[in-house]
Curated annotation (Swiss-Prot):
Belongs to the acyltransferase CrtO family. The gene is crtO. It is found in: Cell membrane. The lineage of its organism: Bacteria, Bacillati, Bacillota, Bacilli, Bacillales. Disulfide bonds: none annotated. This is Glycosyl-4,4'-diaponeurosporenoate acyltransferase.
Length: 165
């Protein structure tokens, strides 16, 4: 019984830790000015093996599950709400590309706090590493799948001269 209480207490504190840390990281991430995401940083580059996002769908079937991921805007009003996308124009697509970069960065950073569990028991470490990966890697994959497709759409719109609606 004493061991069960200890596990429940540990689970509660770990849950609260992740809730507070991830909400704060997301909140801070939304405050990063867009201009930093307009830069061409290597972390956001689509690598050759990704084949413009096709890799992610081929190996992880992204199209089948990406719509099931909770929209961050429901938890944080500062997060871009893509449901309000009324027109497809270069400004909106550029904003969406910026937001894929922001989301990817936020979720990479959200994995790092797992370090705090380094001194914990093996079970606590494994559970928290598993949680950090399962909560963040799928969102990173979706961003890496969507961004090259949005970039290609942006190129097409610019070629057609559809600057603004």
């Amino acid at each position: 019984m004493k061991t069960m209480k200890k596990y429940i207490k540990t689970a509660f504190f770990c849950s609260m830790y992740w809730l507070i840390v991830q909400l704060n990281i997301a909140n801070l991430g939304t405050r990063i000015p867009d201009k930093y995401f307009r830069q061409k940083y290597i972390i956001f580059k689509s690598f050759n093996f990704e084949k413009h996002g096709k890799f992610w769908n081929k190996w992880f079937y992204v199209r089948k599950w990406k719509h099931k991921i909770l929209d961050g805007h429901q938890l944080n009003q500062n997060i871009y709400d893509q449901r309000h996308l009324m027109t497809i124009n270069t400004d909106e697509i550029e904003k969406m590309i910026i937001e894929t970069k922001r989301a990817e960065l936020i979720h990479w950073i959200s994995i790092l706090p797992v370090i705090i569990f380094n001194k914990g028991s093996r079970l606590v470490k494994y559970i928290n590493i598993f949680y950090a990966m399962i909560a963040n890697v799928p969102i990173i994959i979706v961003q890496r799948y969507n961004r090259p497709r949005l970039t290609q759409l942006l190129r097409i719109l610019k070629r057609r001269g559809e600057r603004h609606d």
